[in-house]
Amino acid sequence: MSNCELTVLKPAEVKLVKREREGIINPMYDCQPAGAQYAGIGVKDCIPLVHGGQGCTMFVRLLFAQHFKENFDVASTSLHEESAVFGGAKRVEEGVLVLARRYPELRLIPIITTCSTEVIGDDIEGTINVCNRALAAEFPERKIYLAPVHTPSFKGSHVTGYAECVKSMFKTITEVHGKGQPSGKLNVFPGWVNPGDVVLLKRYFKEMGVDATVFMDTEDFDSPMLPNKSIETHGRTTVEDIADSANALATLALARYEGATTGEYLEKTFAVPNSLVNTPYGIKNTDDMLRKIAEITGKEIPESLVREPRIAWIALADLAHMFFANKKVAIFGHPDLVLGLAQFCLEVELEPVLLLIGDDQGSKYKKDPRLQELKDAAHFDMEIVHNADLWELEKRINDGLQLDLIMGHSKGRYVAIEANIPMVRVGFPTFDRAGLYRKPSIGYQGAMELGEMIANAMFAHMEYTRNKEWILNTW
């Protein structure tokens, strides 16, 4: 008998935990009204009205301007002390009429609550009834939809706020129009993605010959100023698009936590079949998305989209084993982004040992099938912290966690700089690197972009911290 001993590898442990502290130190996520405002600006002829203090609008618009380098119209009821004590319903009524008078093309106003207006208990639905009567009396020839969006800042995050606003806008409009003739279109909810991602998705649908409507269509967030164009930026999604969603062939949600509930609403109310796939970060998730589209629509995947993943695989294979293998990564941000990036990292031999999710939907995360997929694919232990903040990342680094790379939005840059760890900017907001909102992160092209960004961040770090001629020794 041989004296050789077998080494039994310990199964990887994927541990899901919640931040233990009550207080938040260096938050990594924004409030619910911020997400609701982002959903609102994705619709043409729509101006969100934030029922709260001016700061609830001003600082969010600043984030949008930093990330997209564009100006967006968001209104505020400018709640002050008197309204905080005696109620702010009058501020909403005045705000709606001012917007209707000032913007003749206005067709949709999501009325977004904040922590203060939720605490004082303003009756938004009742106030909307009053506003509808006033609008009908002053503008009998116009139909302006008012959507109630309950987004108190003391719970949830920009992710839940986005999902709540999308669902409320669809519910408000589709309830009026009801079910019509089948359109044969595919509703697509990509979640909180960049304009570059929307452009890529629309190219995929065009190449497959699929008549799809992307909600919300943010392609025009990156558009030039033209003589016939307003100074304010808005999305391409129209009220007609939303109304027609009830007549679609099917709905495809690409983000479990960012808009998927609207697909469930359309299925329950109008019998529109609803499907959910993993956000298409990386090659496999993109393959799965295209197969699902083909299954739903009966369309063939064209040769161009058969060739594209092969190009991506070659590009990533040139980097994976030589440069990425066994490199430890921490990822932070909103849930669909973080879990999707973790899956991508495993495809290219990176090891996402720490995932920080800036949202508290713990019961939902436990049921997320991606956790089991990560466990099945990983050969190392992984910690997933939900309701996390950036102190969780900083503390683990200070306690000795060895990392080769950090992935997340620009608010985590100080942690990376102080720890001297290379960082790839991805997610929202990213304002300390140029042009990232134009580039896709999803799909085959997005996989190549991410791989090259990761490699270049590591290469620059090697040059500045170890050996400026390191590449000669590698090749």
From Swiss-Prot:
Catalytic activity reported: N2 + 8 reduced [2Fe-2S]-[ferredoxin] + 16 ATP + 16 H2O = H2 + 8 oxidized [2Fe-2S]-[ferredoxin] + 2 NH4(+) + 16 ADP + 16 phosphate + 6 H(+)
Keyword Iron on entry: yes
Matching InterPro entries: ChlB/BchB/BchZ, Nase/OxRdtase_comp1, Nase_comp1_CS, Nase_VnfK
Cofactor (UniProt): [8Fe-7S] cluster
Span of the signal peptide: none
GO CC terms, sorted: vanadium-iron nitrogenase complex
Residues engaged in binding [8Fe-7S] cluster: 31, 56, 115, 153
Single annotated GO MF: nitrogenase activity
Domain of life, source organism: Bacteria
Coiled-coil boundaries: none
Cofactor binding note of this UniProt entry: Binds 1 [8Fe-7S] cluster per heterodimer.
Keywords recorded for this protein, A-Z: ATP-binding, Iron, Iron-sulfur, Metal-binding, Nitrogen fixation, Nucleotide-binding, Oxidoreductase
E.C. numbers: 1.18.6.1
GO biological process per UniProt: nitrogen fixation
Function, in words: This vanadium-iron protein is part of the nitrogenase complex that catalyzes the key enzymatic reactions in nitrogen fixation.
UniProt similarity note: Belongs to the NifD/NifK/NifE/NifN family.
Subunit structure: Hexamer of two alpha, two beta, and two delta chains.
Designated name of the protein: Nitrogenase vanadium-iron protein beta chain
